[in-house]
Every structure is written in C-alpha cells, then in structure tokens.
C-alpha cells in the first residue's frame, strides 16, 4: 500500500529538517510526502524543497486542520498519515503502519508519544517535560500528532 504523508507547517524551520530526514530515511519506500505551508514566514518551504515532496503554499494562515485537509485533496496514497512537523518517526514506523493496514479489520492507527527528548538544551528539555506531562495526563498516553486513517 502507498502511504500519503501529510505535514502541515507553520514557521517550522527549527524542526522540519529532522522530521523530513526521519521520513526519507525510513526502511519503507512506497510513500509520498505533501508539505503544506500555512503561510509560513520563515524558511520552512526552502527546507522542504530539499526533499522529493509536493509543496503547497497557502496564501493565509488558516491553521493545521485546514492545511491537513488541503493535503488530503492532493493525496494519492491508500493510507493517509498526518504528521506534525516536529515529530520524528522511527525508521520502521511506516513499515509497521503498512503491515497493520494490510489487516482489513484495521481502520485507524494512532501513534504513541516517546519520552526521549529530541533537543538537549535545558530550556527545551524543561518545555518538553512540562508539555509531555500535561499532554499525556490529559490524553491517557495517546499522542495525536501522528495519526493515520485508512481512506
């Protein structure tokens, strides 16, 4: 199955490269990436241009939900994967997604947040810890940034 990876970005220049590197270094190769710039004013689009992906640029900021929906309109895959620009997937994540959707009883899959901090400076670690604690306690350990829906 082909996976359409939809990544909305808004001034994501600090995290987008790492997100895209993780996707393109995946051991699963049957995918397309659609990056939707939600009227970013930083160099997010220039970063995305370094990868083999489709880039949509919205004329005004309308939020990540609108951007995701625009990405869905361009998707050609059998599986939709909504990935936030600050999410770094594991090398085998796309393979696991594909394998799970081969079971026709599966309609949706949701990712789980990892506690391993991506960035090592003290301020960022504090912010990640604080955010993680509240997101996890409110969502009962579910992480919504990486969510897939079978078309």
What are these language model-derived features?
Residues 58, 83-85:
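Catalytic metal- and UDP-sugar-binding loop of GT-A-like glycosyltransferases, i.e.
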Residues 58-75:
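Glycine-rich, basic loop-to-helix element that forms the pyrophosphate-binding segment
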Residues 62, 87-88:
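Acidic metal-phosphate-binding loop of nucleotide-sugar-dependent transferases
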Residues 80:
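Short aromatic/hydrophobic "clamp" motif used to bind/position activated sugar donors
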Residues 111-115, 123-144, 149:
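Short, flexible, basic/aromatic active-site loop/helix in glycosyltransferases
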């Amino acid at each position: 199955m082909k996976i359409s990876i939809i990544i909305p970005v808004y001034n994501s220049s600090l995290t987008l490269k790492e997100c895209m590197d993780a996707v393109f270094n995946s051991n699963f190769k049957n995918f397309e990436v659609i990056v939707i710039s939600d009227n970013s004013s930083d160099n997010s689009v220039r970063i995305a241009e370094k990868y083999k992906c489709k880039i949509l640029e919205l004329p005004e900021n309308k939020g990540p939900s609108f951007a995701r929906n625009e990405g869905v309109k361009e998707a050609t895959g059998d599986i939709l994967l909504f990935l936030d620009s600050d999410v770094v997937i594991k090398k085998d994540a796309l393979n696991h997604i594909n394998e799970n959707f081969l079971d026709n009883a599966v309609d949706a899959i949701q990712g789980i947040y990892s506690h391993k901090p991506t960035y090592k400076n003290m301020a960022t670690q504090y912010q990640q810890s604080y955010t993680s604690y509240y997101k996890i306690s409110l969502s009962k350990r579910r992480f919504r940034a990486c969510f897939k829906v079978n078309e």
